[in-house]
């Protein structure tokens, strides 16, 4: 299920093209994710000092937080080539073998959506990661035979938004595991200002902060909003972005101070107006909104839940006090305290 909204975290073709021009090349330029950055700096320096390939790295976390960017930075810091592919693209064991046999010593192979590798491909990957060898079947039927091919030492970087779907044998073969967290407004403000500087956009600190506050903790969304605010400023404000201009642009884009768009607000309003705040089943909610169940579950709800505007219970979805306050309403049906004592009526 893709999220093509302006505040969607999934990558669009425009995002990919724009990101290439503003992507940091070094860890020093990789803003935010301080623990990850500090750890990777040590691991990279140690591997280079020993003359070894860096241990295999698993990077996981929500979309749009910089997993692909970090893989490019790691390869640049190591001074080696980066080969980029994704789980769904590697359909057969032979596809993976072709990638692996073309690697040079210490190269980095980046597999996005690694949780989508097929079991057959995974079986080939295990000895490649562990022993730098692969077994390939030559021929068919009774004449088929297995040959062992030695590989140069390399680093596999796997990225996934769904670490729970990785098989245990694959997960256990990564020596370094890094989780990317959502960014603070201050970190996103620095990212917006850096992107604006590279793209030649006249943007004040207050203007960058206004964009950052509505970016849902996600650099990809922040950079996308920056490009749209730039368009607005170019036509309406002489190309200058300050706080009032950013606010006016966000109003045009219908992105509110919480980073919600029309669909987010419509979901909360429907829950309050039609279902008295809940609990309401997902099918009923989807029917009331004329949206697919999958869209609500995979695209809309996660951020609302993460920010505390919505809760899932055994009986259905419920709007929280925070949701009522966001809409300027007094809670009609406050969510019950799950840990409240039940009165003794016996």
From Swiss-Prot:
Q: What quaternary arrangement does the UniProt entry report?
A: Homohexamer. Forms an RuvA(8)-RuvB(12)-Holliday junction (HJ) complex. HJ DNA is sandwiched between 2 RuvA tetramers; dsDNA enters through RuvA and exits via RuvB. An RuvB hexamer assembles on each DNA strand where it exits the tetramer. Each RuvB hexamer is contacted by two RuvA subunits (via domain III) on 2 adjacent RuvB subunits; this complex drives branch migration. In the full resolvosome a probable DNA-RuvA(4)-RuvB(12)-RuvC(2) complex forms which resolves the HJ.
Q: What is the name listed in the Swiss-Prot or TrEMBL entry for this protein?
A: Holliday junction branch migration complex subunit RuvB
Identify the keywords attached in UniProt to this record, alphabetized. ATP-binding, Cytoplasm, DNA damage, DNA recombination, DNA repair, DNA-binding, Hydrolase, Nucleotide-binding
Q: Quote the gene name from the UniProt entry.
A: ruvB
Name the job this protein performs.
The RuvA-RuvB-RuvC complex processes Holliday junction (HJ) DNA during genetic recombination and DNA repair, while the RuvA-RuvB complex plays an important role in the rescue of blocked DNA replication forks via replication fork reversal (RFR). RuvA specifically binds to HJ cruciform DNA, conferring on it an open structure. The RuvB hexamer acts as an ATP-dependent pump, pulling dsDNA into and through the RuvAB complex. RuvB forms 2 homohexamers on either side of HJ DNA bound by 1 or 2 RuvA tetramers; 4 subunits per hexamer contact DNA at a time.
Q: Which cellular component appears as one GO term in the record? A: Holliday junction resolvase complex
Which residues are recorded as binding DNA? 293, 312, 317
The record's section on SMART domains has: AAA (SM00382)
Query: What note about domains is in the entry?
Result: Has 3 domains, the large (RuvB-L) and small ATPase (RuvB-S) domains and the C-terminal head (RuvB-H) domain. The head domain binds DNA, while the ATPase domains jointly bind ATP, ADP or are empty depending on the state of the subunit in the translocation cycle. During a single DNA translocation step the structure of each domain remains the same, but their relative positions change.
**CDD domains per UniProt:** AAA
Spell out the PANTHER family in the cross-references: HOLLIDAY JUNCTION BRANCH MIGRATION COMPLEX SUBUNIT RUVB, PTHR42848
Where in or outside the cell it occurs: the entry states: Cytoplasm
Family that this chain belongs to: Belongs to the RuvB family.
GO MF, one example: four-way junction helicase activity
**Which residues participate in Mg(2+) binding?**
68
According to the UniProt record, where is the region Small ATPAse domain (RuvB-S)? 184-254
Catalysis performed (reactions): ATP + H2O = ADP + phosphate + H(+)
**Cross-referenced InterPro entries, in alphabetical order?**
AAA+_ATPase, AAA_lid_4, DNA_helicase_Holl-junc_RuvB, P-loop_NTPase, RuvB-like_N, RuvB_C, WH-like_DNA-bd_sf, WH_DNA-bd_sf
Spans annotated as Large ATPase domain (RuvB-L): 2-183
Pfam families linked to this entry = AAA_lid_4 (PF17864), RuvB_C (PF05491), RuvB_N (PF05496)
Residues involved in ATP binding: 22-23, 64, 67-69, 130-132, 173, 183, 220
Q: Enumerate the Gene Ontology biological process terms.
A: DNA recombination; DNA repair
Coarse class of the protein's main subcellular location:
cytoplasm
Which E.C. number(s) belong to this protein? 3.6.4.-
Head domain (RuvB-H): region residues: 257-346
């Amino acid at each position: 299920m893709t999220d093509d909204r302006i505040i969607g975290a999934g990558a669009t073709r425009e995002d990919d093209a724009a990101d290439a021009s503003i992507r940091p090349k070094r860890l020093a330029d990789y803003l935010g994710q301080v623990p990850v950055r500090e750890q990777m700096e040590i691991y990279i320096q140690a591997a280079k000092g020993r003359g070894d390939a860096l241990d295999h790295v698993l990077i996981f976390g929500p979309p749009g937080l910089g997993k692909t960017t970090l893989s490019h930075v790691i390869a640049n810091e190591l001074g080696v080539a980066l080969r980029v592919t994704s789980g769904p693209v590697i359909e057969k064991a032979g596809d993976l073998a072709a990638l692996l046999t073309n690697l040079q010593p210490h190269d980095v192979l980046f597999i996005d959506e690694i949780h989508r590798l097929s079991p057959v491909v995974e079986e080939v990957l295990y000895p490649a990661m562990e022993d730098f060898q692969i077994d390939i079947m030559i021929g068919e039927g009774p004449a088929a035979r297995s040959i062992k091919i030695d590989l140069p030492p390399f680093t596999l970087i796997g990225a996934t938004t769904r670490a729970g779907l990785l098989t245990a044998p694959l997960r256990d073969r990564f020596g370094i595991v890094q989780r990317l967290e959502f960014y603070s407004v201050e970190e996103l403000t620095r990212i917006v200002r850096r992107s604006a500087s590279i793209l030649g956009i006249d943007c004040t600190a207050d203007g960058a902060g206004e964009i950052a506050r509505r970016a849902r903790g996600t650099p990809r969304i922040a950079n996308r909003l920056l490009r749209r605010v730039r368009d607005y400023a170019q036509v309406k404000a002489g190309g200058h972005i300050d706080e009032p201009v950013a606010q006016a642009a966000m109003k045009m884009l219908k992105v509110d101070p919480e980073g919600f768009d029309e669909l987010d607000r419509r979901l909360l309003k429907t829950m309050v107006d039609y279902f008295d705040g809940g609990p309401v089943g997902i099918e009923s909610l989807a029917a009331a909104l004329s949206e697919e169940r999958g869209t609500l579950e995979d695209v809309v709800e996660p951020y609302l839940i993460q920010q505390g505007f919505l809760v899932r219970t055994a009986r259905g979805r419920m709007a929280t006090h925070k949701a009522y306050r966001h809409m300027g309403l007094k809670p009609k049906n406050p969510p019950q305290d799950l840990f409240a004592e039940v009165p003794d009526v016996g």
